[in-house]
Swiss-Prot record:
Job description of the protein: Orphan nuclear receptor.
Zinc finger (NR C4-type) residue numbers: 17-37, 53-80
Gene (name only): nhr-54
Protein known as: Nuclear hormone receptor family member nhr-54
Family indicated by similarity: Belongs to the nuclear hormone receptor family.
InterPro entries: C.elegans_Orphan_NR, HNF4-like_DBD, NHR-like_dom_sf, Nucl_hrmn_rcpt_lig-bd, Znf_hrmn_rcpt, Znf_NHR/GATA
Domain NR LBD: 161-422
Keyword Zinc-finger: yes
Organism: Caenorhabditis elegans
């Protein structure tokens, strides 16, 4: 039996930007801010901008009625610094050296960058060459905001062109509908590559981020959350969502061959065999492919046993894959973020569990045999085993990445590391 949506409606709260007091958009650089103030701070740091107080006092009241239309850039940035907005708060301190003197009108942020940096503000630019303050060698700063621009747009909209199609569907059916819609783009005759530059993988990831954002927005419970909460969830779940979706999609396309030859679809058009391709890491590390593959390669291969093998044995349906995705995403987000994310997740998972029960009942038709119920219970247990193994593998992957970053294995840093902990 489904839970009536009106019986346990939840109200979620939003936060205000600590800088300008407008609607907040989550934590950026260590402080709850709106998107505009976060982008302003990022541009100031990355582009080495210098400001002077418009009133020459350095004491403009940012966020007050008198400054709500036009904010003094110097005082706005000074307030960012005073409230604790630093790149250190997002774990980019291993690359960026911030020196601030907020008390004078000549204050500026000095970001050590190479001579190759352009003077213009290119909001679509992803990579910046900088000097690593620990190793003093060249390093790459990846601006995550440029990568997730379209994903954020998806997360902030409340309109879908197929609203009239899904209005009669229950929550699990909506998630399944979206999964099928996204997978309709998949080529069943993909190109196989044997070599790829690590930075080229971002093109795959950007597309998969958009798919993740689109899929999440088909959850009514997710859509009711404030924007900053949706972004926070998206940041940490896109990678684990991508992993399950790509491995199960590969198994659907290639069948047993996927498991036997260790094939993975990296995008809707591209695939590779783990035994017959390598990634060029030379641009971001001097460790070499063999060492990096030894560190992470085995952890990726394990998913053929965790995901592909049971998928083939159970012949999982799209509905069951959508259910597993929901379980992984909301359990993982709830553990990491807790609070209203955890509450929303518990509510949503309870509803889709009832939806899955109805799905199995509909498959049985008029049959109410005990063996049918026993089969579905055993099937559900194996599906939840996939969920638990995925969550455990995710934790180990995070620990490996943390160690790699601690010992400066990569000379690459992200403006928002949460996106790429895995």
């Amino acid at each position: 039996m489904e839970i009536p949506s009106t019986s346990s409606e939840m109200t979620y709260f939003s936060v205000k930007c600590a800088i300008c007091y407008k609607a907040g958009h989550g934590q950026h650089f260590g402080v709850e801010t709106c998107r505009a103030c976060a982008a302003f701070f990022r541009r100031t740091v990355v582009l080495n901008r210098k400001y002077k107080c418009t009133r020459k006092s350095g004491k403009c009241k940012i966020g007050s009625d008198e400054t709500k239309d036009v904010m003094c850039k110097f005082c706005r940035f000074k307030k960012c610094i005073d409230l604790g907005m630093t790149t250190e708060n997002v774990r980019t301190d291993q690359v960026i050296n911030l020196n601030v003197e907020p008390s004078t009108s000549q204050s500026l942020v000095r970001l050590e960058m190479t001579s190759l940096q352009p003077e213009t503000d290119d909001s679509n630019r992803v990579q910046y060459q900088i000097i690593h303050p620990r190793t003093r060698g060249p390093a790459i700063l990846i601006d995550v905001n440029a990568i997730i621009k379209r994903s954020k747009t998806i997360l902030e909209t409340h309109f879908f062109p197929d609203d009239d199609v899904i209005v009669e569907l229950n929550p699990l059916e909506k998630m399944t509908f979206c999964l099928r819609k996204l997978r309709s783009k998949q080529s069943w005759n993909p190109n196989f590559f044997t070599k790829i530059n690590f930075l080229d993988l971002f093109e795959f990831w950007e597309s998969q981020m958009e798919d993740t954002a689109t899929w999440l927005m088909y959850s009514g419970e997710f859509r009711k959350l404030p924007n900053h909460e949706k972004i926070a969830i998206f940041k940490i779940v896109w990678a684990v969502w991508r992993r399950l979706e790509r491995y199960t999609m590969t198994a659907q396309v290639f069948g047993q061959k996927c498991y036997d030859e260790q094939i993975l679809l990296h995008s809707h058009q591209d695939a590779a065999r783990f035994t017959d391709y390598d990634v060029d890491y030379s641009y971001i590390t001097d460790q070499g492919f063999e060492k990096i593959n030894g560190l992470f390669g085995g952890k990726m291969i394990q998913y053929f046993d965790i995901i592909v093998k049971p998928y083939l044995e159970l012949e999982l349906s799209d509905t069951e894959i959508a259910y597993i995705l929901c379980q992984i995403v909301w359990n993982y987000a709830g553990r990491r973020l807790q609070g209203q994310t955890q509450a929303a997740g518990e509510r949503f998972l309870e509803v889709i569990s009832n939806n899955l029960h109805k799905y199995y009942e509909d498959k049985s038709g008029n049959r109410k045999r005990a063996e049918d119920k026993q089969n579905y219970v055993a099937r559900l247990a194996k599906m939840m085993q996939i969920v638990n193994q995925m969550l455990n593998a995710q934790l180990k992957m995070e620990n490996t990445m943390d160690v790699a970053m601690l010992f400066n294995t990569f000379n690459i840093v992200f403006t928002e590391p949460e996106f790429f902990r895995v």
